[in-house]
């Protein structure tokens, strides 16, 4: 089954069948292109698939000329605060939140939120 959702809060789906590393690279590349480079923070949660998606997002962002700051395992409020405090151009949060274990999500946001 392929379940993939794209909305204002990012992209989320079943890991492997809908949400893949290849898709994450494309999604991060689109975000990096939209930001026109700049500095982007990336953070993850503790899901087993999150490091794979972090690596994919790094690849996509770096390919578009972004500088990437690795925040490691970091909750969303801390990442939002860091973007404002450090003057980053945006961030990508990788984490499943309230979704079941086989799902994950990639949530981009700019310095404006």
Residue ranges and their predicted role:
Residues 1-59, 63-65:
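An N-terminal, well-structured beta->alpha segment
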Residues 36-111:
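Ferredoxin-reductase
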């Amino acid at each position: 089954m392929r379940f993939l959702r794209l909305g204002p809060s990012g992209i989320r789906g079943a890991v492997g069948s809908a949400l893949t590393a290849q898709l994450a690279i494309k999604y991060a590349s689109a975000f990096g292109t939209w930001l026109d480079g700049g500095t982007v923070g990336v953070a993850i949660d503790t899901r087993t698939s999150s490091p794979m998606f972090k690596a994919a997002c790094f690849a996509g962002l770096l390919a578009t000329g972004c500088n990437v700051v690795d925040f490691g395992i970091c909750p969303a409020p801390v990442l939002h605060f860091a973007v404002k405090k450090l003057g980053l151009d945006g961030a990508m949060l990788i984490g499943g939140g309230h979704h079941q274990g086989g799902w994950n999500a990639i949530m981009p946001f700019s310095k404006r939120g």
